[in-house]
A protein has these predicted regions:
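Aromatic-rich peripheral "rim/lid" segments of glycoside hydrolase catalytic domains that contact
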Residues: 58-69, 223-283
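Glycoside hydrolase catalytic-domain groove-lining segments
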Residues: 92-107, 111-189, 205-209
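Short, solvent-exposed loop/turn and secondary-structure capping segments
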Residues: 51-56, 156, 182-184, 232-234
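Substrate-binding cleft of secreted/luminal carbohydrate-active enzymes
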Residues: 36-40, 45, 175, 189-248
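Aromatic-lined substrate-binding rim segments of carbohydrate-active enzymes
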Residues: 1-33, 96-112, 117, 158-166, ...
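Active-site beta-loop-alpha junctions enriched in small/polar residues
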Residues: 1, 44-48, 123-125, 149, ...
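The substrate-binding groove and active-site-proximal loops of carbohydrate-active enzymes
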Residues: 2-21, 84-99, 142-152, 186-200, ...
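Polysaccharide-binding and catalytic clefts of secreted carbohydrate-active enzymes
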Residues: 8-13, 35-132
Length: 283
């Protein structure tokens, strides 16, 4: 996962020390309070919000764990037993977990640095498709960060849902494609694989055009600047041998990719205006 791992994939949001922990972490942001070069903060990466949360908390090993106690109390308030849990209950509870997380974290960040944006926790996978989770993010984030894989073309329906659910703009904080002409094996990572660097450039343009057309995307981050280093020790299992970078491991630029990126990027605002005009014309 894109996080360090939690027991049963349960974040410690119901622990009585969670607020204190967040406050202590956020105190470090005072040093950045007046920094004009900072846009905002991500508070975490790919946290395990999702439909497995409810049973996860209910089956924590320690019966006195605050998360388990909270989940048992929540289940009792719903008037249901463990055997009566439905997918609707699972998604509702995932929203409760996300609500608690974003409320506490956002308040801590803004207490010590009210001058920069809170960009969320980089939702990925299943969580980004669950209404209650995205709604919770929208209530407390200025912009909702999404790591978006598994789609050649950004889904119009999904992006529309993000806007309706969060009532906030979104930013794509991870996406990429890998090229087979790089000499790397490309066996790890979530991005699609294409044949050449030129095709990586086409894939970039295609994906970003879809984001611009949505009317609610305020930015995108390519993952990542440099290729994976197959000789690196202790690398994350998703970052072992793949052509993800703008540059290779000898710091050479993948020029066809970079040229395609530049061609689109310098026209991004004009393209966004054009898509807006088309949308208004079709209404």
């Amino acid at each position: 996962p894109g996080n360090t791992g939690y027991p049963n994939q349960c974040i410690f949001v119901f622990d009585p020390e969670f607020e204190t922990y967040c406050d202590e972490m956020a105190q470090k942001l005072v040093a950045n309070k007046m920094d004009k070069n900072i846009i905002g903060y991500f508070s975490d990466n790919e946290l395990p919000f999702g439909p497995k949360n409810l049973e996860g908390y209910l089956t924590l090993q320690n019966p006195g764990d605050p998360g388990r106690v909270y989940a048992e109390s929540w289940l009792k308030k719903q008037g249901i037993t463990l055997q009566q849990i439905t997918d609707e209950h699972r998604e509702e509870f995932a929203g409760v977990v996300a609500e608690r997380y974003y409320k506490v974290v956002s308040e801590a960040i803004r207490k010590y640095d009210p001058n920069h944006l809170y960009l969320g926790s980089r939702l990925h996978g299943k969580p980004k498709f669950i209404r209650q989770i995205v709604e919770a993010a929208g209530r407390y984030c200025d912009v909702v960060a999404i790591n978006y894989y598994g789609a050649w073309t950004p889904s119009e329906k999904t992006m529309k849902h993000w806007g309706e659910w969060a009532q906030k703009p979104f930013i794509i904080t991870e996406f990429y494609t890998k090229g087979m002409d790089s000499g790397l094996a490309n066996t790890t990572g979530a991005g699609f694989t294409v044949q050449t660097q030129q095709e990586r450039g086409y894939a970039y343009q295609h994906f970003v055009l879809g984001l611009l057309e949505s009317g609610n995307c305020v930015g995108w981050h390519w993952f990542r600047y440099q290729d994976n280093d197959p000789t690196a020790k202790g690398a994350d299992p998703s970052n072992l041998d793949s052509n993800k970078g703008l540059i290779d491991n000898e710091y050479n630029l993948y020029k066809p990719l970079a040229d395609a990126m530049k061609e689109l990027n310098i026209n991004a605002y004009r393209l966004a205006d054009w898509f807006d005009q088309q949308s208004n014309t079709n209404q």
